[in-house]
Every structure is written in C-alpha cells, then in structure tokens.
C-alpha cells in the first residue's frame, strides 16, 4: 500500500474515534492544529500497534497539521533512521507541552544521542526546547539512573538552578520534575537537590 493510502486509512480510523468534547477542550487550552480529532493516547497507541515502524510513513504523518498524526508519527518512527538533524527539525515544530511530552515518551528518550540533545536543549533560549530538555532528562534518569560525569552533573544542576528561578511556569515545573527524578536516584543525589532547594533555587 502506498504511503498516501496508508495515511488515508489512518485518518479514517481517527474519524471513528473522534471526540468532539475533547477536541474542543484542547482548542480552548490553546492547542493549534488544522485538525484535532480529540483521541486519547491509549487509542492512538492501539492504532500505532496496527502498523510496522516506518520512517517514510512517520515523516509523512509528522508533516500533517493534525494532532493525532503527529503523535502517531512518534510511535511509528524507527530510532535507527531518526538522525540528530531530524530531531532538531521536529523540535522546531513542537509548539505545545502535550506534544512535547508524547514525542519525548514515545521516541526521543529511546534515541542513542538522547542525552546530548537533552543538554543542548536545556541550554537553549527557546522555552519549548528548554522544556523538552528537562523532560528528556527526567526520562533518562528514570531509565538509566544518575550516571553522569562530574562536568555533565554540574551542567545539569546549573541549568536546573537557572530554570527554577525562571518566571516561566512550564520551564520551572519541567526543571523541578527532572530534579525530583534525579533526587530519587540515590542518597547523594537527594542531598544535593535538597541543598539546592534549601538555597532557594
């Protein structure tokens, strides 16, 4: 089946599960897409399970200005063909925290260069990149623990400290979440974070 035919088939499945109430609620929360079907994540994952991971299909889905297509793309994108420059392109096109969270969970945390991207984005001046950087660190701490060299640890703490002093609530919350996950990795990390918070970060 051609990619365009597969996408038409996927959209027909989306229409079956369309939820107008959720769609309207998401728009009221500020999500801006050409189309929002209002389908919840478990159902999108069920649809994803019906297809083999496919780079061309995932890239075509990502180009659609449709919420569910972009989320599905993250589940169907093979890791091995998702190069760092493509990750940067996707990151530039993520404009809300919902999509950032889903893409991070489904794809970015599995990338072999995930930690490099996390540090790159945490140091960005773009708020959504900073948010993604901390969300990615949260996932990496959960998956891999707090194994970092001293330089990386110091950089993470410095970036988190700066973010905690930010007036941007989403950045601050993402940094706090990453710090909490880091603290859960061991007594040393817990004490380090507690000292940071006590100091008024």
Q: Which stretches of residues belong to each language-model region?
A:
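Alpha-helical scaffold domains
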Residues: 1-201
């Amino acid at each position: 089946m051609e990619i365009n035919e597969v996408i038409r088939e996927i959209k027909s499945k989306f229409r079956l599960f369309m939820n107008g109430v959720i769609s309207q609620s998401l728009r009221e929360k500020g999500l801006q897409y050409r189309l929002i079907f209002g389908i919840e994540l478990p159902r999108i994952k069920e649809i994803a399970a019906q297809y083999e991971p496919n780079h061309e299909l995932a890239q075509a889905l990502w180009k659609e200005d449709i919420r569910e297509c972009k989320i599905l793309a993250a589940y169907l994108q093979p890791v091995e063909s998702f190069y760092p420059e493509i990750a940067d392109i996707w990151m530039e096109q993520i404009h809300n925290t919902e999509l950032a969270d889903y893409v991070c969970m489904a794809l970015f945390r599995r990338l072999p260069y995930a930690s490099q991207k996390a540090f790159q984005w945490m140091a960005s001046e773009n708020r959504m990149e900073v948010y993604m950087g901390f969300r990615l660190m949260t996932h990496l701490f959960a998956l891999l623990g707090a194994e970092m060299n001293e330089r990386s640890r110091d950089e993470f703490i410095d970036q988190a400290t700066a973010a905690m002093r930010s007036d941007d609530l989403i950045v601050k919350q993402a940094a706090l979440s990453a710090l909490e996950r880091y603290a859960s990795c061991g007594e040393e990390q817990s004490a380090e974070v507690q000292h940071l918070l006590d100091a008024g970060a």
